[in-house]
Amino acid sequence: CLGARTGQEVKAFRNLDIESIGIDIVPNEPLVIFGDIHEIPFNNNKFDIVFTNIVDHSLYPNKLVEESERVCKKDGIIIFHITVGKATDKFGVTEILKSQSVENLFKNSKILKSQHMEPWHGLNWEIILKKISN
């Protein structure tokens, strides 16, 4: 989980028996270790699932996507929950007007779903992708 803050998402994955770890620039161990979403501190092709809901907090969304694809295994799943068409929260630096502006950043993944989701803490769009190549 990228930008995992206190680790709620990590805990949710673990509750589903999915081995997981979070990274954030403010660690909260044991669920969240220190790491920058623009330079993910893991080897290539490490994870079956990559999840984030902080694209709007990314200074360089293209680098976040590139790093997400790098650490995701071939045939792995990448899930981005984003806020589309609304102002971001107080930590946001990237406003997303259309989901395509994020979708188009992916070079090695195929979109499985890109759809509106029930708004939750401002997040209103879900993009689910499958990594198809390295």
Regions picked out by a protein language model, each given a short descriptive name:
Residues 85, 89-117:
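Conserved Class I S-adenosyl-L-methionine
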Residues 109-134:
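Core SAM-dependent methyltransferase catalytic element
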Residues 62-77:
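A short glycine-rich, Lys/Arg-flanked "PGG" loop and its adjoining helix->strand segment in the class I
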Residues 75-85:
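Conserved beta-strand signature within the Rossmann-like core of class I S-adenosyl-L-methionine
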Residues 1-39:
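Class I SAM-dependent methyltransferase SAM/SAH-binding core
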Residues 38-50:
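A short acidic, Gly/Pro-enriched loop at the edge of an enzyme's catalytic core
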Residues 48-61:
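A short SAM/SAH-binding and catalytic strip from SAM-dependent methyltransferases
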Residues 59, 73, 107:
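Short conserved AdoMet
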